[in-house]
UniProtKB/Swiss-Prot annotation:
Similarity comment text for this entry: Belongs to the RecO family.
GO cellular component: bacterial nucleoid
Any one biological process term the GO annotation gives: DNA recombination
Reported function: Involved in DNA repair and RecF pathway recombination.
Protein name: DNA repair protein RecO
Protein species of origin: Rhizobium etli (strain CIAT 652)
NCBIfam families (UniProt xref): reco (TIGR00613)
InterPro entries found in the cross-reference section: ARFGAP/RecO (IPR037278), DNA_rep/recomb_RecO_N (IPR022572), NA-bd_OB-fold (IPR012340), RecO (IPR003717), RecO_C (IPR042242)
Coiled-coil spans in chain: none
Keyword field: DNA damage, DNA recombination, DNA repair
Gene3D superfamilies recorded: Nucleic acid-binding proteins, Recombination protein O, C-terminal domain
Origin organism lineage: Bacteria, Pseudomonadati, Pseudomonadota, Alphaproteobacteria, Hyphomicrobiales
Record bears the keyword DNA damage: yes
Length: 256
């Protein structure tokens, strides 16, 4: 068995004295593990860092075996990703999200999105918005997609201001007004118009939105918590937009 694919390094685990088991996100074969011989060598260590883009050749006698990777560098961005808190936490948080998906399950759109986000992690506003959209895409692929295109009550596609915590569907401002205190806010940049840039308030609302549904549909049923890196990323992204922010609280909430 053999195949070749574009991949992004998610992490590594030591294996024996000189080798590692690499975890990568491939474009056409999903999240995949493989043994890299001499992966702890001086030549390979800089290549096998999270966030780097590589070309991998996987070989195994049988498809169900772990197999071995031969890894060639393509874009070594790991050093740059260590320069900001949003980048450090962002790489870890996206890896944790991808681990929610079955191994070897293809998600090419998530691979493409991951590459885009990795190249924008230096800009907190861009990184925050892209990360929220990434979380929405993961929710969708897990079978818990949100319907943000029209009002659940009226079918209207304009002035959408809320999301029902029960149905995960958008609600217009007028239809949701009587229950506004029980609704989740729909950030303007996630609306159908999509012509609003993310600012501090809308990004904080977006993190609450995705955090709520990830906790409800994924983490709680699996008896797990969100990765600490997500909280770190949320804090770093929002603090970059509002340096006066001191604390972030709760799995789904933000407090100043």
């Amino acid at each position: 068995m053999q195949w070749q694919d574009h991949a992004i390094i998610l992490g590594i685990k030591r294996h024996g004295e000189t080798s590692v088991i690499a975890e990568v996100m491939t474009r056409d074969r999903g999240r995949h593990l493989g043994l890299v011989r001499s992966g702890r060598s001086r030549a390979m260590q800089p290549v096998l860092q999270p966030g780097n883009a590589v070309e991998v050749i996987w070989r195994a006698r049988l498809d169900e075996h772990l197999g071995e990777f031969r890894v060639e560098p393509v874009t070594l961005r790991a050093a740059r990703l260590m320069e900001t808190a949003t980048a450090v936490y962002g790489v870890q948080a996206m890896g944790a999200l991808l681990r929610l998906l079955p191994e070897r399950d293809p998600h090419p759109h998530l691979f493409d999105a991951l590459e885009v986000i990795l190249d924008h992690l230096h800009n907190p506003a861009d990184a925050g918005e892209l990360f929220v959209r990434f979380e929405l895409a993961v929710l969708n692929d897990l079978g818990f997609g949100l319907d943000l295109g029209e009002c659940a009550a009226t079918g209207a596609r304009s002035d959408l201001a809320y999301v029902s915590p029960k149905s995960g569907r958008a609600v217009s401002r007028s239809a949701g007004a009587p229950w506004a205190d029980k609704m989740l806010l729909l950030p303007p940049f996630l609306g159908v118009e999509g012509n609003h840039a993310a600012d501090f308030d809308s990004l904080a609302a977006a993190f609450r939105l995705t955090g709520f549904f990830l906790h409800r549909h994924v983490y709680e049923p699996r008896g797990m918590e969100a990765a600490a890196a997500r909280d770190g990323f949320v804090q770093a992204a929002l603090k970059a937009l509002n340096p006066a922010l001191r604390t972030l609280a709760g799995p789904n909430g933000v407090s100043a």
